[in-house]
Amino acid sequence: MSSPMPDCTSKCRSLKHALDVLSVVTKGSENQIKAFLSSHCYNAATIKDVFGRNALHLVSSCGKKGVLDWLIQKGVDLLVKDKESGWTALHRSIFYGHIDCVWSLLKHGVSLYIQDKEGLSALDLVMKDRPTHVVFKNTDPTDVYTWGDNTNFTLGHGSQNSKHHPELVDLFSRSGIYIKQVVLCKFHSVFLSQKGQVYTCGHGPGGRLGHGDEQTCLVPRLVEGLNGHNCSQVAAAKDHTVVLTEDGCVYTFGLNIFHQLGIIPPPSSCNVPRQIQAKYLKGRTIIGVAAGRFHTVLWTREAVYTMGLNGGQLGCLLDPNGEKCVTAPRQVSALHHKDIALSLVAASDGATVCVTTRGDIYLLADYQCKKMASKQLNLKKVLVSGGHMEYKVDPEHLKENGGQKICILAMDGAGRVFCWRSVNSSLKQCRWAYPRQVFISDIALNRNEILFVTQDGEGFRGRWFEEKRKSSEKKEILSNLHNSSSDVSYVSDINSVYERIRLEKLTFAHRAVSVSTDPSGCNFAILQSDPKTSLYEIPAVSSSSFFEEFGKLLREADEMDSIHDVTFQVGNRLFPAHKYILAVHSDFFQKLFLSDGNTSEFTDIYQKDEDSAGCHLFVVEKVHPDMFEYLLQFIYTDTCDFLTHGFKPRIHLNKNPEEYQGTLNSHLNKVNFHEDDNQKSAFEVYKSNQAQTVSERQKSKPKSCKKGKNIREDDPVRMLQTVAKKFDFSNLSSRLDGVRFENEKINVIAKNTGNKLKLSQKKCSFLCDVTMKSVDGKEFPCHKCVLCARLEYFHSMLSSSWIEASSCAALEMPIHSDILKVILDYLYTDEAVVIKESQNVDFICSVLVVADQLLITRLKEICEVALTEKLTLKNAAMLLEFAAMYSAKQLKLSCLQFIGLNMAALLEARSLDVLSDGVLKDLSEFYRKMIPAMDRRVITPYQDGPDISYLEVEDGDIFLKEEINMEQNHSETMFKKAKTKAKKKPRKRSDSSGGYNLSDIIQSPSSTGLLKSGKTNSVESLPELLTSDSEGSYAGVGSPRDLQSPDFTTGFHSDKIEAKVKPYVNGTSPVYSREDLKPWEKSPILKISAPQPIPSNRIDTTSSASWVAGSFSPVSPPVVDLRTIMEIEESRQKCGATPKSHLGKTVSHGVKLSQKQRKMIALTTKENNSGMNSMETVLFTPSKAPKPVNAWASSLHSVSSKSFRDFLLEEKKSVTSHSSGDHVKKVSFKGIENSQAPKIVRCSTHGTPGPEGNHISDLPLLDSPNPWLSSSVTAPSMVAPVTFASIVEEELQQEAALIRSREKPLALIQIEEHAIQDLLVFYEAFGNPEEFVIVERTPQGPLAVPMWNKHGC
């Protein structure tokens, strides 16, 4: 990798570099991009091309999330915009559909509301990309969102807390109620549902809520007095409510201080809805209502009616008799013309506005009817606020010079809004001071501001500009209007033609169809289309296989199985069956099984001992076996072949002597032999007997049978019908009425499906033969045949030789009783009514998890359908993650589409933070497929960029680490590079308890911390490594977990171990002396699997030779490179044979050697017994252990017959015997007995210096069987021979240990786990940078190899 160009600095602005960087971003992999950016230019992350795009912009556009996160960690500016369109990286990632990159940017603080040059934010881009089939209409199912100060509980959230942004009124969404109109007032709110029901909430004094009392309602409550009336419109003011029904009736309730209710005689208040009945309204159809604080307005197509306090807003003059209030509805005479046809009416506290179909707008105020505008055609909505009331009319409630200025808003079908204000007394069209065009679909008005809803579902809040403003503000307005791409010809006369409105976008409004506000502007409501409106990916439930499963149970029934509990012998055939299935379908069989063997009252059936499986055996007489088989087929499957049109039954109706031996004997007994028969032929005798038999049959035949002259005795359909009646199967008998046997085949004339009988746990409870027990102790008696037929899980459990099949105790299921009940109900009824009716999403998810575990596919699909119906903006991300985790594919697809359709709302609410990286990737792919325009948004890789083929996959990580450590000294930099080289080959950990992983053997580092002995390139072959019984393959080393990697740094801190290295003698490698290792103080003997420091060998030519063990600190220990190893091996080879000590014993350096290599070393040691007397050695060879029994999973402990204490004593004697002449210092040990208590291992970064200043590790040297750090001073000749008795004793000990381990109770294991966790907390093991603490169980000795034993053999 070449270094950056010499003329490149941190302020580089080279266009060539920018093009190279962007080219690599478009065509390189993530690691290649990282490597190139780290090496090509010092300013690669921020350098821009001619369009103002930098690497961050292109990475976001291409969806390279790994590079994006890498750049964010580098601290690049995330808010920088390009020159072309003013887009940030967030704009670009949304435009190209990379939601995973969007979420990374949002997590790092990028705002969604930053606008580009066209005034579009990132959310606006999502809105513009919405699929074309998504259109929001007033007729859609809608949800109510409210916000405001909520002083009087008018928002319906159940609390008095204020809301700063729109929040869902969840009462309606939970109940499936859709609202089409909301009216907000000071003390209460009114909600009208699409089904015509009225709900109110707020303060109830005066009866304004209409519930029959004056209690306050925190959440919306149904007005029961209007049940049975389909309401079409509501209006409300401060103290009363007006409701219009579809049939033109008007109901009012609330305070009637000003006679605004229109009820005669006028009550002071009315707390239930009462209909307005006036003679002026007879024969009139009211089409609309409106309400102000002091009055109520009704109108038809031809006239307007008002009632209430007459302060000038009723459209009539003062009463000359001094009547201040109009009690009954009175028509406005000023609007009583032949040509007037009313279309819209609105009212405020002090004014009334009427609109005709001709476009004339009239204002009723100050006891006058003024025409404010004309020819305003196609108006869809009109609003009014403010107004002045005559103070003298009611001084108690009115203030002198009170009221506000009148403002009228009108919206036409094209979305244009017109405004009339008493300030300028002219109707002006509104212009929006907003960077882009907006198209209005609904408006709302209060005394301070205007609220808008656009056709794209957005919400805005608008305010009038001040009359007096600075010149700079005027310039800003004009520039904003110019940017809105609208006609600017009005600018010269802007003050007189247009009303200027400054807009502010509402948050969390993305599907709005309607908006409303209270008159004071304190509380607001917005109706948004249901987020599932455009969802078409709906899960489907597969067809039922209920009867097919029971048919399979019947076909697989056998005399020897353990599922059937009754057998029927019909003729010479046996039919194994199941009592519960027969008894639940037939009262005959239910009584038979209740008789307990007493069959005297049953004809043609009796009990006979038991069958081969020990079940009850019943003999059925006078029934054809094939007929009984068809009967069983119908019982189990609700159908049979005789109900299939065109079926040709293959049934032998002629009596077989073998099958009906008893019947034949009875016929023979009836034959009369006379003396006259001696002279007759056999045929004549037979013919006479047949005639006699026929006559007897006719005599014995009942009279009722004479009617069925055309029923043949050989008709199989009638025979089956007779059998069905005999065994009380009326359903089959009635269905066979429409079946005929013609031309040797079945002809179905009329299909009679009948009523399908549902199974139930409560039916025939005396036949329950298995009990399920839930995890909370609740028991469910069940029937084994149903469980085995419906679920393979129970079939495998109860039909085999498992202990559950024969146990009389309840079967404990690790499932809660509520969930287990749903599972069992589904198995019996093939339905899940509880799931369909449940509103608890968590419960349904729990059932889905259990259904997935038990492989109940159809129940899982039912849960998916139920969860899809309960998808909301709050739980969509959670359900998507849940569906991905449990492979609920249909639910996942629905969640993906739901999130894609509501992407703007979910991004603004930050609801996607629960998604994992993989699920976010899937969401990005689905979102790009969902948007058709994404197919054209493809960034073509630049072809003219630099060649990056030389960059390897790992280069990005290498250069990242190099850049981080660039300012460190040279030695530390080289140290890091050596570490990354060692990390190039990935390591894998084995999950087994012992043995090596193949990748660990092949990819192990060339040096493990101690210098190799032997010849150059003397590396064991793979078979030798796998089959060697040397100390290196000792089971105590076991898994690769016990062999710490030299580059393993995270969380480990250990003291450094220093030892003196004697100068080379004749080019030989250094040999270490036991004197150089200082004994540690008070160090306990550690576990075998404790982390061990791995020494690293570095030769320092400028100072005295020394070796330092690797420290498990955040800085990785140095690793001996290949060149050093080759030099050492070369020096060894020059020296000749393996060096020997003056003791005549072989020096082992911890390398795992084969048996052949050990023999060669031993021979070399005997031959070369001189020349090395000046050297001191350290013996690191572990104690020899027998070969493990199982080569694939070797035991973690030694299987030697000697105890650990024997080894210590033996080693101590050996060291003592040579201490005088060898100058080898003894190493003290403190052994502890193995116990159940956990051991704590500390790897401290603060070592204890020895007398000579050397740091000694806290880790023991000889207690661990690790081949790198263990030693053995026992010569092979001193090992005692292994006897057969010791082997047998050892095997018995291992068997006993295995039994103890296997029968260890779960409670004890849990206690130990709690103890381990408590110790970890006590010793501050978590997040401790100074110490690495391990708490583990101590081993209890070797265990025998587990063996599978099959019972019953």
Curated annotation (Swiss-Prot):
<dbReference type="InterPro" id="IPR002110">
    <property type="entry name" value="Ankyrin_rpt"/>
</dbReference>
<dbReference type="InterPro" id="IPR011333">
    <property type="entry name" value="SKP1/BTB/POZ_sf"/>
</dbReference>
<feature type="region of interest" description="Disordered">
    <location>
        <begin position="970"/>
        <end position="1001"/>
    </location>
</feature>
<feature type="repeat" description="RCC1 1">
    <location>
        <begin position="141"/>
        <end position="194"/>
    </location>
</feature>
<feature type="repeat" description="ANK 3">
    <location>
        <begin position="806"/>
        <end position="835"/>
    </location>
</feature>
<feature type="domain" description="BTB 1">
    <location>
        <begin position="564"/>
        <end position="644"/>
    </location>
</feature>
<feature type="modified residue" description="Phosphoserine">
    <location>
        <position position="1045"/>
    </location>
</feature>
<dbReference type="InterPro" id="IPR051625">
    <property type="entry name" value="Signaling_Regulatory_Domain"/>
</dbReference>
<feature type="repeat" description="RCC1 2">
    <location>
        <begin position="195"/>
        <end position="246"/>
    </location>
</feature>
<dbReference type="GO" id="GO:0016020">
    <property type="term" value="C:membrane"/>
</dbReference>
<feature type="modified residue" description="Phosphoserine">
    <location>
        <position position="1039"/>
    </location>
</feature>
<dbReference type="GO" id="GO:0001933">
    <property type="term" value="P:negative regulation of protein phosphorylation"/>
</dbReference>
<comment type="subunit">
    <text>Interacts with the PH domain of BTK. Isoform 2 does not interact with BTK.</text>
</comment>
<dbReference type="InterPro" id="IPR036770">
    <property type="entry name" value="Ankyrin_rpt-contain_sf"/>
</dbReference>
<feature type="compositionally biased region" description="Basic residues">
    <location>
        <begin position="976"/>
        <end position="988"/>
    </location>
</feature>
<dbReference type="GO" id="GO:0005654">
    <property type="term" value="C:nucleoplasm"/>
</dbReference>
<dbReference type="GO" id="GO:0019901">
    <property type="term" value="F:protein kinase binding"/>
</dbReference>
<keyword id="KW-0472">Membrane</keyword>
<dbReference type="Pfam" id="PF00415">
    <property type="entry name" value="RCC1"/>
</dbReference>
<dbReference type="GO" id="GO:0030292">
    <property type="term" value="F:protein tyrosine kinase inhibitor activity"/>
</dbReference>
<feature type="repeat" description="ANK 1">
    <location>
        <begin position="51"/>
        <end position="80"/>
    </location>
</feature>
<feature type="modified residue" description="Phosphoserine">
    <location>
        <position position="1030"/>
    </location>
</feature>
<dbReference type="GO" id="GO:0005737">
    <property type="term" value="C:cytoplasm"/>
</dbReference>
<keyword id="KW-0963">Cytoplasm</keyword>
<feature type="modified residue" description="Phosphoserine">
    <location>
        <position position="1111"/>
    </location>
</feature>
<comment type="function">
    <text>Acts as an inhibitor of BTK tyrosine kinase activity, thereby playing a role in B-cell development. Down-regulates BTK kinase activity, leading to interference with BTK-mediated calcium mobilization and NF-kappa-B-driven transcription.</text>
</comment>
<feature type="domain" description="BTB 2">
    <location>
        <begin position="768"/>
        <end position="836"/>
    </location>
</feature>
<dbReference type="Pfam" id="PF12796">
    <property type="entry name" value="Ank_2"/>
</dbReference>
<dbReference type="InterPro" id="IPR000210">
    <property type="entry name" value="BTB/POZ_dom"/>
</dbReference>
<keyword id="KW-0677">Repeat</keyword>
<feature type="repeat" description="RCC1 3">
    <location>
        <begin position="248"/>
        <end position="301"/>
    </location>
</feature>
<feature type="repeat" description="ANK 2">
    <location>
        <begin position="85"/>
        <end position="114"/>
    </location>
</feature>
<dbReference type="InterPro" id="IPR000408">
    <property type="entry name" value="Reg_chr_condens"/>
</dbReference>
<feature type="modified residue" description="Phosphoserine">
    <location>
        <position position="1004"/>
    </location>
</feature>
<keyword id="KW-0040">ANK repeat</keyword>
<dbReference type="InterPro" id="IPR009091">
    <property type="entry name" value="RCC1/BLIP-II"/>
</dbReference>
<keyword id="KW-0539">Nucleus</keyword>
<keyword id="KW-0597">Phosphoprotein</keyword>
<protein>
    <recommendedName>
        <fullName>Inhibitor of Bruton tyrosine kinase</fullName>
    </recommendedName>
</protein>
<feature type="compositionally biased region" description="Polar residues">
    <location>
        <begin position="992"/>
        <end position="1001"/>
    </location>
</feature>
<feature type="modified residue" description="Phosphoserine">
    <location>
        <position position="1033"/>
    </location>
</feature>
<dbReference type="GO" id="GO:0051209">
    <property type="term" value="P:release of sequestered calcium ion into cytosol"/>
</dbReference>
